[in-house]
Amino acid sequence: MTTASLITIGRILLIPVFVTVAIYYAHSVREHATDDRLRIAAIVIFTIASLSDAVDGWVARRFNQQSRLGAILDPLADKLLILAVLGVLCFSDWPVHLPLWFVVIAVSREVLSIAGAFLVDHLVGTVKIEPHFTGKLSTPLQLLTLGLAMLEAERLMLPVAILASIFAFTSGMIYIHEAWKQIQASGQHQPPSGPRA
C-alpha cells in the first residue's frame, strides 16, 4: 500500500474521531456548560482531515503513487467527511446556521455520486468517469464552508457557500451526463427485446 493511500485511510479514520468530539461539544452546549476546548479540538481534527486531501494528492503525484485503490478511497474519504460534518452540524446543538440550499445541494451531490458510481459499476463493470475541474473545486470549497461555519464566520461563509454550491451542482450534472453516456455505450439502458414471432 502506498504512502498516499495510507494518508487517505488516515483521513477516513479521523472522521469518527471528529464526530465523537463534535457530539461531546454539542452535548456541552445543550447542557448549558459549553466546553470550547471540545469545539477547538473538533475544528483542529476537521482541518487536519481536510488538509490531508491535498497532501495525499501531492504525494501521489510527486512520487508516482497513483493507484486504483487511491482513486477509489480519495473521493470516498472526501464524501464521507463532508456528509459526517453536515450530519453533526445539522442534527446536533452546534450553534451554526448553514443555508438549507447548501445542505441540500451538498448532500444530493455526494449521495448521487456514490449511488451513481455503484450503479455504473454494476451495469457496466467499471467506472471510467474522469474527475472534472468543477468537482475538484467544489470539494475544497464545501470543506471551507463547513470550517467557516464551525468558526461562526457567517459573513465569510455565505459567498464561499454560494460558490461551492454552484460548482457542486455543475459537477453533479456533468457526472450524471458522463455516467449516462457510459451506460449507453455499454447497451445496458436498452430494454430486452420481446420474443419474435
What residues fall within each predicted segment?
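Alpha-helical transmembrane bundles and membrane-interface segments of multipass inner-membrane proteins
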Residues: M1-A197
